[in-house]
Curated annotation (Swiss-Prot):
Pathway(s) of this molecule: Amino-acid biosynthesis; L-proline biosynthesis; L-glutamate 5-semialdehyde from L-glutamate: step 1/2
Enzyme Commission (EC) number: 2.7.2.11
Top enzyme category: transferase
Protein name: Glutamate 5-kinase
UniProt xrefs under SMART domains: PUA (SM00359)
Binding site for ATP: 14, 173-174, 215-221
HAMAP family: ProB
Molecular function, one GO term: glutamate 5-kinase activity
C-alpha cells in the first residue's frame, strides 16, 4: 500500500453478519482471512483500525451444531455467549498471522448512556489503539435486554467512531452501496456515489432496502452515517466482497456510497448527547418553537411546548417533535416530566410561581441540545 495515498489516520470497520457468513449459516473463514489481511495492511501502514464485528449468534449456532432452540431472548443470549468467544478467538488467530494483537470491548446502551461510563469506554478504546492493539467491538448480546440494547451494529459502529475520534467509518454489507431504487427489483437502479446531506427523501429511499442477514438494513446504515458525519466522521457504505474494498476506500478510490462529514462537527459533549443517552421522553412543540430551535439556534422555552410524552427526570434526554412525530432535535431536560406538564404553554417568567423553584428559563437549553 502506497503511504502517500492514505487519507485517514483512524478507521472503524463494521462487518455485518451477511459479510462474515457470505450468505451461509456459518462463518466464512476464508473471507475473514482476506478481511483481516486488508486491516493488517492498514495497521502496518500506520492507520489505526477499530473492528466492529457482528456474527456472534451465527458463530454460536455453528459451534453448537445448529441446535433446535425456542425463539426466545434467553436462546439468543445463550448463542451470543457461546458465539462471542468463538468469534473473538477466530479474529485473534487471524490477526496473529500478521503479528497483531486484539482486545475485546463488549458494550451496551447503558455504557453509552452514562457520561462517566461513556468516557471510561473511550479511555479503554484509546488505550488499546495507542498500544497498537486492534479493538474488536460488539454489542454485549449475552446480557443486553431491549431496554439497554443499542439495537444493531451499524449504530454501534457509529458510536465507536465517535468514542475513538475516528475520521472514517466503513460499513461493509452485501450491497454495493445506497441505490436510487431497490436493485433487486429495478434493474435500472443506479448507485448513489456521493451524499452531502441526509434528508427525508433519502431516508425513505433507504427504508425498504434490507441486507440479507442480521439486524441491520440500509435504513440503520443511514442512521449510523448521519450520527457519524455530524461528528466530523466520513462514512462509506460498500460491499464487503468487493476486491480490496477496505484498502480502496481508505485510499479514497471510488467505491460504494461516500457520505461527506459536516464541515463544522459537533463538539464532544453534544456528540455524546446525540449518540449516547436513549431518549426517555418526547416534547411536542409548536411551529414557532420549531423555527426558534432549528433556524435560530435558540433554547426551547415552556411556551412552545404543547404536549409531554413519557416519564422522565431532570437531566434525562428527550426528543423534540411536531404533532406528526417528526424529530427535530434531541436534548437534555432541565425539568422532570411532571414539571414540564405543569409548565407547557406558559411563559418562562412564571416558572417559579408555578413550581415553587426555578432551574432556568429554558426547558431544554441550546447548549444541551443537538438539532437533527
Amino acid at each position: 500500500m502506497n503511504l502517500s495515498e492514505i487519507g485517514y489516520r483512524r478507521v472503524v470497520v463494521k462487518l455485518g453478519t451477511s459479510v462474515l457468513t457470505s450468505g451461509s449459516l456459518k462463518l466464512d473463514k476464508a473471507h475473514m482471512v482476506e478481511l483481516a489481511r486488508q486491516m493488517a495492511c492498514l495497521m502496518k501502514a500506520g492507520v489505526e483500525v477499530v473492528l466492529c464485528t457482528s456474527g456472534a449468534i451465527a458463530a454460536g449456532k455453528e459451534h453448537l451444531g445448529y441446535p433446535k432452540l425456542p425463539d426466545t431472548i434467553a436462546s439468543k443470549q445463550l448463542l451470543a455467549a457461546v458465539g462471542q468467544s468463538q468469534l473473538i478467538l477466530a479474529w485473534s488467530q487471524l490477526f496473529s498471522i500478521y503479528g497483531l494483537h486484539v482486545g475485546q470491548l463488549l458494550l451496551t446502551r447503558a455504557d453509552l448512556h452514562d457520561r462517566e461510563r461513556y468516557l471510561n469506554a473511550r479511555d479503554s478504546l484509546n488505550a488499546l489503539l495507542n498500544n497498537g492493539i486492534i479493538p474488536i467491538i460488539n454489542e454485549n448480546d449475552a446480557v443486553a435486554t431491549a431496554e439497554i440494547k443499542v439495537g444493531d451494529n451499524d449504530n454501534l459502529s457509529a458510536r465507536a467512531a465517535l468514542l475513538c475520534d475516528a475520521d472514517l467509518l466503513i460499513l461493509l454489507t452485501d450491497q454495493k452501496g445506497l441505490f436510487d431504487a431497490d436493485p433487486r427489483k429495478n434493474p435500472d437502479a443506479k448507485l448513489i456515489t456521493e451524499v452531502q446531506n441526509i434528508d427525508d427523501s433519502l431516508r425513505m429511499l433507504a427504508g425498504g432496502a434490507v441486507s440479507g442477514l442480521g439486524t441491520g438494513g440500509m435504513a440503520t446504515k443511514l442512521e449510523a452515517a448521519d450520527i457519524a458525519r455530524r461528528a466530523g466522521v466520513e462514512v462509506v457504505i460498500a460491499s464487503g466482497h468487493y476486491k480490496d474494498v477496505i484498502q480502496n476506500v481508505v485510499c479514497k478510490k471510488p467505491v460504494g456510497t461516500h457520505f461527506t462529514a459536516l464541515e463544522h462537527p459537533l463538539e464532544s459533549r453534544k456528540q455524546w448527547i446525540l449518540a449516547g443517552p436513549k431518549a426517555r421522553g418526547q416534547l411536542v412543540i409548536d411551529a414557532g418553537a420549531i423555527g426558534a430551535v432549528t433556524e435560530k439556534g435558540r433554547s426551547l422555552l415552556s411556551k412552545g411546548i404543547t404536549e409531554v410524552k413519557g416519564l422522565f427526570q431532570r437531566g434525562d434526554t428527550l426528543e423534540l417533535i411536531d404533532t406528526k412525530g417528526k424529530v427535530y432535535a434531541k436534548g437534555m431536560s432541565r425539568y422532570s416530566s411532571a414539571d414540564v406538564t405543569k409548565l407547557a404553554g406558559k411563559h418562562s417568567d412564571s416558572i417559579e410561581e408555578v413550581l415553587g423553584y426555578d432551574y432556568g428559563d429554558a426547558v431544554v437549553h441550546r447548549n444541551d441540545m443537538v438539532v437533527l
